Amino acid sequence: MATRPTDMVNTMQDAAVTCGPIPGSHKRYLGGVRFPELRIPLREIRQSDSRKRDGSLEVNPAIPVYDCSGPYTDPDVVIDIHAGLPAMRWQWSPTDTAIESRPEPGSAYGRARLADVRTADLRFHHRREIRRAANGGNVSQMHYARRGIITPEMEFVAIRENQGLEHLRASHPALFRAHRGESFGAQIPDTITPEFVRDEIARGRAIIPANINHPELEPMIIGRNFLVKINANIGNSAVTSSIAEEVEKMVWSIRWGADTVMDLSTGRHIHETREWIIRNSPVPIGTVPIYQALEKVDGKAEDLTWDLFRDTLIEQAEQGVDYFTIHAGVLLRYIPLTANRLTGIVSRGGSIMAKWCLAHHQESFLYTHFEEICEIMKAYDVSFSLGDGLRPGSLADANDEAQFAELHTLGELTRIAWKHDVQVMIEGPGHVPMQLIKANMEEELQHCFEAPFYTLGPLTTDIAPGYDHITSAIGAAQIGWYGTAMLCYVTPKEHLGLPDKNDVREGAITYKIAAHAADLAKGHPGAQVRDNALSKARFEFRWEDQFHLGLDPEKAREYHDETLPQEGAKAAHFCSMCGPHFCSMKISQDLQEYAQSKGEDIETARLEGLQEKAEDFKRLGKNIYLR
């Protein structure tokens, strides 16, 4: 049954979101240098001390890690989703005074929703002023970067990318032990500086999605010379979910590591749902504006118009959406190229625009009005996520002519956007077998001029409905290694239904694994610190530290306690897998202690131990079996 507005009101009145620190961690903030007012968040994972053989203690340092959970994991912050998060960015030193404020929405639809008494109880009531560039100006991060200006957002992300690891390099060099990576041409410095960030944005190799109407945002950067990021999709549909559920899904997503969130709502009250999400989101929010535009014409793609779509862009930009997926590369002449595909056009946005092109037998208004779209984007600093409307929906269709024809057009559109100093990233597939994945990255780098690549997986096999978070994470780790800057998560419900909270968590953790594996393979400085800390804790049977250093401390503890729930088991030198007598790490520890007691290296001690056992065999009568 459809949810009535009164039901939605009650839901929001009683709404609550997940708050509180992640187990074993505490929030820490770093300050800016150029902009001292900055407070850059990170999470520190506390560790217990190690007890040496002589009884003395070795202090293990807290491990700082990148954190995108916002104030929701800070116990010192009082969360009120009805008030929203603080407008932090509006308190920073202004980069440009050429910004005007508007008391009322500039979009016709925004004004209509504001005047509609039927939606009054659904609205987010603490309205922010609406800002935009004055006199046709440009407030994009790329515009400032190309003028040689370092913005507060640029310093923020530079400090954030370094993860506060600098102090550990001198004090605990063993934590930085790592294998040499293969970056496939990426140029990752040992330390990220604000100037490096500025240069990468000016070149178009990275973006900071940060709409000036999203002051609650904690800025982040997307680019192949930075940490690989992940995106989580949320959103209601015509049959499921409420505003409160979507706000909680956003908070839940970022708790488990989502760097950005896309609101793909297609149900009722899209405008109001999005406002609640943005006002409470510390991460960039992306949308696919054509979805809402389609709802405005009752789902009839052929009735879409440029004027309607333009108004939708302004409506969403004024709310604070940080990036738009726009399928402007679906051209009329490319549609016949999909005729022989096994699965045709699987992108929802791509199929909408293909239907419009065929109905009118002309190029899409997204393509013909692209420069006008750029004018809107630069006035609010909304980034493009140029959509892959012709992405393959099955292995059989991977890397075909339609897919790459659209990709080349996205490269053409990238250059047009850059002419207007508008930030761009490129969306990618999809369903691709492992041996064809690298070609996707190479094509994108060549034809889209190193603009950041943002891929959905890709899924590496089509035989596992219910497990597509795994089939896609295989491809995601691989393409992330090759240079993809952001990975769009896939949940176990992919192809089957809308994800719930558990699916969101599963998808986010799975993709954090893929992104981190890619960072390790690329040789990202400091990427292996957390791995090394956890491995040391594992070898020393520091169970609590193992739980806390993992991506999902709660699940790690739950699995351990299924078989060894006693509190004393947290100090045991074995787990239920091998038991007390067959633990390889316990045997290795014993060997190390034996060597230390003899004052020898491990190999010498091993040989001596073998010789001692041989002498015992002879002394006891050389019998194979003792009676």
UniProtKB/Swiss-Prot annotation:
EC numbers: 4.1.99.17
Cofactor binding: number and manner: Binds 1 [4Fe-4S] cluster per subunit. The cluster is coordinated with 3 cysteines and an exchangeable S-adenosyl-L-methionine.
An example molecular function term from Gene Ontology annotations: carbon-carbon lyase activity
Metabolic or biological pathway, per its Swiss-Prot or TrEMBL entry: Cofactor biosynthesis; thiamine diphosphate biosynthesis
Binding-site positions, Zn(2+): H431, H495
Keyword Metal-binding assigned: yes
Binding site for [4Fe-4S] cluster: C575, C578, C583
GO cellular component terms given for this protein: cytosol
A Gene Ontology biological process term: thiamine diphosphate biosynthetic process
Matches recorded under Gene3D superfamilies: 6.10.250.620, Radical SAM ThiC family, central domain
InterPro entries: ThiC (IPR037509), ThiC-associated_dom (IPR025747), ThiC/Bza_core_dom (IPR038521), ThiC/BzaA/B (IPR002817)
One Pfam family here: ThiC_Rad_SAM
UniProt: substrate binding residues: N233, M262, Y291, H327, S347, R348, G349, D388, G389, L390, R391, E427, Y454
Cofactor(s) the record lists: [4Fe-4S] cluster
Protein keywords: 4Fe-4S, Iron, Iron-sulfur, Lyase, Metal-binding, S-adenosyl-L-methionine, Thiamine biosynthesis, Zinc
Root EC class: lyase
Catalyses which reaction(s): 5-amino-1-(5-phospho-beta-D-ribosyl)imidazole + S-adenosyl-L-methionine = 4-amino-2-methyl-5-(phosphooxymethyl)pyrimidine + CO + 5'-deoxyadenosine + formate + L-methionine + 3 H(+)
Functional summary from the UniProt entry: Catalyzes the synthesis of the hydroxymethylpyrimidine phosphate (HMP-P) moiety of thiamine from aminoimidazole ribotide (AIR) in a radical S-adenosyl-L-methionine (SAM)-dependent reaction.
NCBIfam families: PRK09284.1, PRK13352.1, thiC
Recorded family membership: Belongs to the ThiC family.
SUBUNIT field: Homodimer.
Protein name: Phosphomethylpyrimidine synthase
Lineage, highest ranks first: Bacteria, Pseudomonadati, Pseudomonadota, Acidithiobacillia, Acidithiobacillales
Gene that encodes the chain: thiC
